[in-house]
C-alpha cells in the first residue's frame, strides 16, 4: 500500500496518525507511507522520531475575528491553503498513493480535498468527541470517516460512511516492561507520578502539579515526578517552581516541555495526571 497521511498542530492529532501508519506497515511491511505537515510544527519532530518521511507544506488556521490584522492573517491563510493544495497535487502525481488519510489539524483540509478532487480514495479520522471544523468540512468529500464514539459520529452527520473505531494507540504503549524499567531508572522503591496537560500545555494542570511537587517534597515520601509543561507552559512552570522553592536540580523531579518516551513513562507510573482529549 502507498499512503499519504496528513496530521498536525498537536500530538493529539499526530500520535493517532503515527499509530495508523505503524499498523499499516505491521500488516503490509512493503507499504510506503509519507506524512504531510508543517516543517516547523510538532509533526516534524514526532514523524522523524517515528522513522517516517514528512513532506512539508505551509498551512495556517483561520481567525474568526474581523479586526483588520486578523483579516490580513486570513487572506494569508487562504493563500497558504491554495498553495498547499498545489503542492499536495504535485506529490500525488509523483507518489501515486492508494489512499490519503486526514487525521486532523488544519493541514488535513487542503490535502484531503485535493486528493478527493483527483479521484484518490480518502479517509478522515476524528479523535475528539466534538468534531473540529476541518472534519465537518471534509466529511462531505471523504470516502470513509472514522469516529471515536457514537456522539462524535452523530455530530459528523454522515452515518452511511462513518465507522466507530475509537482512537488508534501506538503498540509501544502496551509492550514497555514496568518492572525492568523501574529498576533501570532507579525508582523501584519510589512512588512515581507522571503528569502532563497535552502537547500545548494546560495552565491549571501546571499550577496544580507545581503545588503537588511542593507537597511531595514536604511529605517526606520517596517519590519520582515526571512532568510535561507543554509548549506554552515552560516559562510559567519555571516561575512556579521558583515561587515554591522547588530545586530544579533535584534528580527526582524531571520537567520537560514534551515527554518523548511516553510509553516508558506510563509503564513506570503509579499515578498519571492528565487532561481529557485525544
Description of each model-found segment:
Residues 2, 34, 42, 53, ...:
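Active-site-proximal region of nucleotide-activated glycan assembly enzymes
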Residues 3-10, 30-80, 165, 231-233:
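Conserved nucleotide-sugar phosphate-binding/catalytic loop shared by glycosyltransferases and other
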Residues 13-25:
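Short amphipathic alpha-helix
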Residues 28-29, 90-98, 185-188, 268:
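Glycine-rich phosphate-binding loop signature in dinucleotide/nucleotide-binding domains
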Residues 46, 178-183, 187-271:
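Donor-nucleotide binding loops and adjacent catalytic segments primarily
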Residues 87-100, 107-123, 136, 140-141:
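Glycosyltransferases and closely related glycan-assembly transferases
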Residues 100, 271-272:
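Hydrophobic acceptor-binding patch used for acceptor engagement in glycosyltransferases
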Residues 104-105, 198, 230, 276-277:
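Short glycine-/small-residue-rich Rossmann-like dinucleotide-binding loops
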Amino acid at each position: 500500500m502507498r499512503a499519504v497521511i496528513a496530521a498536525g498542530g498537536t500530538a493529539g492529532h499526530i500520535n493517532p496518525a503515527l499509530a495508523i501508519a505503524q499498523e499499516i506497515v505491521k500488516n503490509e511491511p512493503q507499504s510506503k507511507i509519507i506524512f504531510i505537515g508543517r516543517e516547523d510544527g510538532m509533526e516534524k519532530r514526532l514523524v522523524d522520531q517515528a522513522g517516517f518521511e514528512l513532506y512539508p507544506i505551509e498551512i495556517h488556521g483561520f481567525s474568526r475575528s474581523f479586526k483588520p490584522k486578523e483579516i490580513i492573517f486570513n487572506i494569508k491563510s487562504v493563500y497558504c491553503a491554495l498553495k498547499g493544495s498545489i503542492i499536495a497535487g504535485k506529490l500525488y502525481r509523483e507518489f501515486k498513493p492508494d489512499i490519503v488519510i486526514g487525521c486532523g489539524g488544519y493541514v488535513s483540509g487542503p490535502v484531503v480535498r485535493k486528493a478527493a478532487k483527483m479521484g484518490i480514495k480518502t479517509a478522515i479520522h476524528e479523535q475528539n468527541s466534538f468534531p473540529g471544523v476541518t472534519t465537518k468540512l471534509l466529511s462531505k468529500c471523504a470516502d470513509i470517516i472514522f469516529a471515536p464514539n457514537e456522539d462524535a459520529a452523530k455530530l459528523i452527520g454522515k452515518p452511511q460512511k462513518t465507522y466507530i473505531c475509537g482512537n488508534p494507540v501506538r503498540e509501544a504503549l502496551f509492550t514497555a516492561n514496568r518492572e525492568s524499567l523501574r529498576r533501570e531508572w532507579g525508582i523501584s522503591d519510589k512512588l512515581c507520578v507522571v503528569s502532563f496537560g497535552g502537547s500545548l500545555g494546560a495552565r491549571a494542570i501546571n499550577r496544580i502539579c507545581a503545588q503537588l511537587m511542593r507537597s511531595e517534597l514536604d511529605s517526606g515520601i520517596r517519590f519520582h515526578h515526571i512532568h510535561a509543561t507543554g509548549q506554552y507552559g515552560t516559562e510559567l512552570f519555571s516561575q512556579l517552581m521558583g515561587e515554591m522553592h522547588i530545586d530544579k536540580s533535584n534528580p527526582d523531579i524531571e520537567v520537560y516541555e514534551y515527554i518523548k518516551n511516553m510509553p516508558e513513562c506510563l509503564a513506570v507510573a503509579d499515578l498519571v495526571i492528565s487532561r481529557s482529549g485525544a
